[in-house]
């Protein structure tokens, strides 16, 4: 199959689910990931077969004999055909509605590659913007980072999380999911102690398995229900950040099947009659764990900006780059 034929096949197979431009972009992602084919090849070499474009490193001529051994050539051919099959299989998965990030097994967030899959919410651009705001604010504060260190723990263990008021600059990510916020902040501030918690064991497994290059220590991840009281033994925090569930159940009708059928509902939705339940719980955690001069960063449903801000005296509602009320910051 040629590059052009594969792109056209993607557009055709994915047309019931995605607009043409989005389906085409997905085709390019599959070609790049599985076949090492950059998107510009669609224009410059549209008739190139996928198999011949794949694994080109195997086709370097032997420097001494100027020939490729038959066994190596056959192995390379098999590898290339396997990759073409993998690419077509990935397209089949996409055609069922499975998210591209789950098919690839990762997503990009704040310049890092995060593992994602079933049971783990896919990070969104709005959350990247939230992290960027935290980073900008902390860099603006000369006292934002002081020495500290941590070690990672497995889900379900909270007993040894002990620190006193003299602990280093600390950040807590509530409803951490994939751990994208916690890891991104740990990468940016190597001297800070970063914690992340979630109730979902599946999400915590992903959070603990991330392999983000750090100059400091790994975040500490622990199991906790944000709707319950904070576990004993946690330190005071200088920053609490959260992207909790905030989409009302009644908003499901406006969402795509690739979200509704695959991503964890418990990480997305709240009851229509209690849309602020997680924010009230976060307020209780902040009352106990946030230092008096600490900062709070929350991602919110644009419909409830003023309602969320009212739970956190001194906070303000901040719009995202699209102009929608998306954050409450204090």
List where the protein language model places each region:
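Ser/Thr/Pro-rich low-complexity tandem-repeat tracts
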Residues: 59, 67, 76-79, 144, ...
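Non-catalytic nucleic-acid substrate-recognition regions in nucleic-acid-modifying enzymes
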Residues: 1-26
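Conserved AdoMet
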Residues: 31-137
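SAM-dependent Rossmann-like transferase core, predominantly class I methyltransferases
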Residues: 89-147, 156-209, 230, 323, ...
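Generic alpha-helical structural context detector
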Residues: 28-32, 92, 132, 151, ...
């Amino acid at each position: 199959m040629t590059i052009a034929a594969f792109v056209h096949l993607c557009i055709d197979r994915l047309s019931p689910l995605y607009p043409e431009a989005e389906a085409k972009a997905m085709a390019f992602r599959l070609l790049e990931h599985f076949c090492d084919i950059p998107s510009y090849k669609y224009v410059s070499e549209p008739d190139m077969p996928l198999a011949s474009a794949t694994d080109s490193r195997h086709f370097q001529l032997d420097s001494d004999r100027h020939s490729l051994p038959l066994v190596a050539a056959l192995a390379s051919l098999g590898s290339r055909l396997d990759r073409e099959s993998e690419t077509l299989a990935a397209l089949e998965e996409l055609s069922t509605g499975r998210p591209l990030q789950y098919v690839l097994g990762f997503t990009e967030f704040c310049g890092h590659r995060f593992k994602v899959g079933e049971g783990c919410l896919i990070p969104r651009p709005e959350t990247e913007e939230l992290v960027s705001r935290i980073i900008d604010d902390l860099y603006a504060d000369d006292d934002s980072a002081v020495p500290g260190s941590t070690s990672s723990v497995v889900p379900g263990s909270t007993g040894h999380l002990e620190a006193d008021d003299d602990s280093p600059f600390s950040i807590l990510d509530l409803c951490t999911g994939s751990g994208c916020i916690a890891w991104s902040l740990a990468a940016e501030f190597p001297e800070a102690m970063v914690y992340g918690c979630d109730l979902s064991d599946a999400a915590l497994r992903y959070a603990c398995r991330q392999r983000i290059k750090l100059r400091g220590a790994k975040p500490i991840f622990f199991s906790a229900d944000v709707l319950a009281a904070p576990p004993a033994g946690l330190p005071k925090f200088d920053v609490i950040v959260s992207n909790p569930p905030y989409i009302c159940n009644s908003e499901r009708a406006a969402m795509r099947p690739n979200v509704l059928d695959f991503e964890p509902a418990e990480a997305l939705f709240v009851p229509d009659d209690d849309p602020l339940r997680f924010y009230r719980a976060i307020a209780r955690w902040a009352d106990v764990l946030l230092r008096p001069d600490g900062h709070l960063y929350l991602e919110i449903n644009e419909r409830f900006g003023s309602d969320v801000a009212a739970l956190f005296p001194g906070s303000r509602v901040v719009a995202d780059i699209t102009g929608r009320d998306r954050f409450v910051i204090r």
